[in-house]
């Protein structure tokens, strides 16, 4: 295993968002490509908003996507003593100081700066205080340099530089003794030996402050890669108003994990004109430098196209297993009807999602299918009664109920009757499936089996005889 170490560090304040999932994927792929270590860390310092339910949802989303982690999950809430040690160390070294300014004082100074057209930032009132008052509430601030430039070479965005005079003296510990995000993320990444930080580009402005903390603590600065955000079709940040944003919502909508992985990685990264990538392809071909600088637009139609591809490519046995809960939601027990893998085989070419497949499979498992009124009125007419009755007799005598055997039997029947397939096919579809939109007739008959096929044909004959 190489020394490369990457991490995904979500906050457990909600579900695993598609943007977070893509960030996790990029980290996972780079770790796997370089033979490194992928670490999962839960950033739960916001105790009021963090929930176990969210932790469970994040872990479930990671597992569904197949993003296995090598270390963790680590929880920041369990590391508070570690953070306090580093705060004390910075205080002892004069690299941090206690600030006694009240929120009211800070707000007044902020408003004054705005009035004067200055950028609001901490004015350093307590930066060089000689006397300390342990009885007064205080925060701890990092003593940032006010001169020079802090720059880094972003693996996606290129060189980014900040004038240090623009940077605040960052609060690293609140009045209640809890550490702040920008501080703990540095301590965690430093002590966990993270070598590359891949995260959303909303963190770019945090980076110079974090680099200064690394340097003050004497730790090597990792490489940074800031991933552009994901937008909705209207070019605004992807949110619930654009549709589902939770990874697990897409699972529940009948998407396959490999389709979601393929889609999310391609949303911002490319390798020539290729669209379809297996997991192994992605591990071999992915580079963070090939991620685009501009935001990606989430396209549900493209995801549907990919999902359809993977449904067509998957084994019927695997899809059957995944389909069971969708059928049960619809009141169907698939163990009571035809072979589910056989049914799946008839629906793979037509189904873009497992939801569509489950809906398309219902007629196989309902003993008393209802006929579509328009289709029945058009195709279940008196003239088809003798044809359906004769077909039932023909199939009853058919010894080979395989696809090829059924095709031969139907062709023979049509020739015997001197008709065209179009005069028979729609009536058979309505009889067996309830409507004319269905898989191929031979596939349906083969999946239903002889007994059920004959029962449905004879039921249609009885319907016509009424």
From Swiss-Prot:
EC id: 6.1.1.17
What is catalyzed by this enzyme?
tRNA(Glu) + L-glutamate + ATP = L-glutamyl-tRNA(Glu) + AMP + diphosphate
Q: Where in the cell is it found?
A: Cytoplasm
Motif span ('HIGH' region)?
10-20
Positions binding ATP in this chain are: 240
Q: Which GO terms describe its cellular component?
A: cytosol
List the InterPro entries hit by this protein, alphabetically: aa-tRNA-synth_I_cd-bd, aa-tRNA-synth_I_codon-bd_sub2, aa-tRNA-synth_I_CS, aa_tRNA-synth_I_cd-bd_sf, Glu-tRNA-ligase_bac/mito, Glu-tRNA-synth_I_codon-bd_sub1, Glu/Gln-tRNA-synth, Glu/Gln-tRNA-synth_Ib_cat-dom
- PROSITE patterns, per the entry: AA_TRNA_LIGASE_I
Main location class:
cytoplasm
Q: Which UniProt keywords apply?
A: Aminoacyl-tRNA synthetase, ATP-binding, Cytoplasm, Ligase, Metal-binding, Nucleotide-binding, Protein biosynthesis, Zinc
Write down the required cofactor(s): Zn(2+)
Task: Name the cystine pairs.
Answer: none
Q: Which PANTHER family match?
A: GLUTAMATE--TRNA LIGASE, GLUTAMATE--TRNA LIGASE, MITOCHONDRIAL-RELATED
Q: Which family does it belong to?
A: Belongs to the class-I aminoacyl-tRNA synthetase family. Glutamate--tRNA ligase type 1 subfamily.
Description of how the protein assembles with itself and partners: Monomer.
Q: What does this protein do?
A: Catalyzes the attachment of glutamate to tRNA(Glu) in a two-step reaction: glutamate is first activated by ATP to form Glu-AMP and then transferred to the acceptor end of tRNA(Glu).
HAMAP family assigned to the protein according to its UniProt record, in alphabetical order: Glu_tRNA_synth_type1
Its protein name is Glutamate--tRNA ligase
Q: Which organism is it from?
A: Geobacter sulfurreducens (strain ATCC 51573 / DSM 12127 / PCA)
């Amino acid at each position: 295993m190489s020394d490369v170490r990457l991490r995904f560090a979500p906050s457990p304040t909600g579900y695993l968002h598609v943007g977070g999932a893509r960030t996790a994927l990029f980290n996972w792929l780079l770790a796997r490509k370089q033979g490194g270590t992928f670490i999962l860390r839960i950033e739960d310092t916001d105790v009021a908003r963090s929930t176990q339910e969210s932790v469970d949802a994040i872990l479930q989303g990671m597992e569904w996507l197949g993003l296995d982690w090598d270390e963790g999950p680590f929880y920041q809430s369990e590391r508070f003593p570690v953070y306090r040690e580093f705060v004390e160390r910075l205080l002892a070294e004069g690299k941090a100081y206690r600030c006694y300014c009240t929120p009211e004082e800070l707000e007044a100074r902020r408003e004054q700066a705005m009035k004067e057209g200055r950028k609001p930032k901490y004015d350093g009132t307590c930066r060089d205080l000689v006397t300390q008052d342990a009885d007064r509430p205080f925060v701890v601030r990092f003593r940032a340099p006010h001169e020079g430039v802090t720059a880094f070479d972003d693996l996606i965005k290129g060189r980014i530089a900040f004038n240090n005079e623009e940077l605040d003296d960052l609060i690293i510990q609140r009045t209640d003794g809890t550490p702040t995000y920008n501080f703990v993320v540095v301590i965690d990444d430093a002590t966990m030996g993270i070598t590359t930080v891949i995260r959303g580009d909303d963190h770019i402005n945090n980076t110079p402050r974090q680099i200064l903390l690394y340097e003050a603590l004497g730790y090597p600065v990792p490489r940074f890669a800031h991933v552009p955000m994901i937008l909705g079709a209207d070019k605004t940040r992807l949110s619930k108003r654009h549709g589902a944003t939770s990874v697990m919502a897409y699972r529940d909508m009948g998407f396959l994990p490999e389709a979601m992985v393929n889609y999310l990685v391609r949303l911002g990264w490319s390798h020539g004109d290729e669209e379809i990538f297996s997991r192994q392809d992605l591990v071999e071909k992915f580079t963070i430098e090939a991620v685009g600088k501009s935001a990606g637009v989430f396209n549900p139609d493209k995801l549907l196209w990919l999902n359809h591809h993977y449904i067509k490519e998957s084994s019927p046995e695997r899809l059957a297993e995944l389909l069971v809960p969708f059928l049960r939601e619809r009141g169907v027990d698939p163990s009571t009807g035809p072979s589910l893998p056989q049914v799946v085989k008839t629906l793979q070419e037509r189904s873009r999602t497992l939801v569509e497949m489950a809906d398309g499979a219902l007629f196989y498992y309902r003993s008393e299918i209802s006929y579509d009124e328009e289709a029945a009125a058009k195709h279940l007419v008196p003239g088809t009664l003798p044809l359906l009755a004769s077909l039932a007799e023909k199939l009853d005598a058919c010894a080979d109920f395989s696809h090829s055997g059924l095709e031969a039997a139907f062709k023979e029947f049509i020739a015997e009757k001197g008709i065209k397939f179009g005069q028979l096919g729609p009536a058979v579809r309505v009889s067996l499936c309830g409507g004319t939109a269905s898989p191929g007739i031979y596939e349906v008959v083969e999946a239903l089996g002889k007994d059920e096929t004959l029962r449905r044909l004879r039921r249609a004959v009885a319907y016509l005889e009424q």
